Structures are given as structure tokens and as C-alpha cells.
């Protein structure tokens, strides 16, 4: 079997993209803002947290949503991971949101990694609704935004449905 989702395309250098991504996070943090990273629960959340731990260990990073449970499953099965120790240390380094008060504290973080990656639910909507008024804050998408998703709506119109209302 051959998977060809990204076949036939030239892609930018991954290391260069990681560097640019991290530089932008630092830029937002330096101006007093918070970066919201809506991420898919399986794989993307863990990859983002490991990257931030590796390249920006000085940041205050909070993780919320189903990606936490997926990470626990991965850590319980280190044999399926390329870098199990990096995931484990990255998870200890980041702050796991597990209560309403944790969620409120996360609003002051440098970076929040949270599900749903397409802004169709999950804690990301809660964070977006609270961070959207402060222009120092930013949202960074790291995955595909399907037609009809909240993320695609935000990219195309500058508005996203939050609790059935389109808000800028």
C-alpha cells in the first residue's frame, strides 16, 4: 500500500518551518499575548508539545482537551513511539489543564495547545471566546481546516461560530 495524500507536492523544509513557527510564538509572547494552538487530539497535540519543549523550554505552555488522554495512552505504550522519553519529559514540563480554575490560569500562558483542531468544539472554542478581544493574542493553525469547519470559516471570513453565533 502507498499513501499519497501529500504526493506530487514540494514541501518546505520541516526544520525551517518549526523554526519559523517558534519564532512567531516568541514574537506573540514578547508582546504580552497568548498563542492558542487548536490541535488534533491524536498525534498533533503531542507533536506540538514536544516541539515547544525542545525549542522553547522557557515558555509557559498549557495543554487541554482529549489530547491529554491520547498522550497518556502513548506513554503507557512507549514501544510504539519514536521518542518516548521526549514525550514523557515534555508532558511533565507542560501544564495539564484539569479543572475550571486551571482553564482560567491557562489564559495567562504563553501558549495553549487544545483540541478541537478545526474549532468545531472542544476547549479551543472556550479559549478563543476569551482571547479574541485582545489583539496581542494569536491563533496558530497546524492542520487542515475542512470546508464548513470553524477553522475554515475563521480563515476565510475572519469569523467563527461560537455557540451558534458568528463572532469576529
For each feature predicted by the language model, list its residue ranges.
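Acidic/His-rich, metal-assisted hydrolase cores and their charged scaffolds
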Residues: 1-168
Amino acid at each position: 500500500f502507498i499513501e499519497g495524500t501529500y504526493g506530487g507536492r514540494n514541501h518546505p523544509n520541516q526544520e525551517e518551518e518549526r523554526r519559523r513557527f517558534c519564532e512567531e510564538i516568541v514574537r506573540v509572547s514578547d508582546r504580552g499575548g497568548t498563542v492558542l494552538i487548536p490541535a488534533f487530539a491524536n498525534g498533533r497535540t503531542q507533536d506540538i508539545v514536544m516541539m515547544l519543549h525542545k525549542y522553547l523550554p522557557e515558555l509557559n505552555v498549557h495543554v487541554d482537551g482529549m489530547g491529554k488522554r491520547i498522550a497518556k495512552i502513548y506513554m503507557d505504550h512507549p514501544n510504539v513511539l519514536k521518542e518516548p522519553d521526549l514525550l514523557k519529559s515534555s508532558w511533565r514540563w507542560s501544564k495539564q489543564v484539569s479543572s475550571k480554575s486551571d482553564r482560567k490560569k491557562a489564559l495567562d500562558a504563553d501558549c495553549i495547545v487544545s483540541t478541537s483542531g478545526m474549532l468545531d468544539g472542544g476547549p479551543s472554542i472556550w479559549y478563543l471566546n476569551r482571547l479574541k478581544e485582545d489583539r496581542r493574542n494569536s491563533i496558530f493553525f497546524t492542520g487542515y481546516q475542512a470546508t464548513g469547519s470553524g477553522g475554515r470559516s475563521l480563515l476565510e471570513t475572519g469569523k467563527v461560530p461560537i455557540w451558534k453565533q458568528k463572532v469576529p
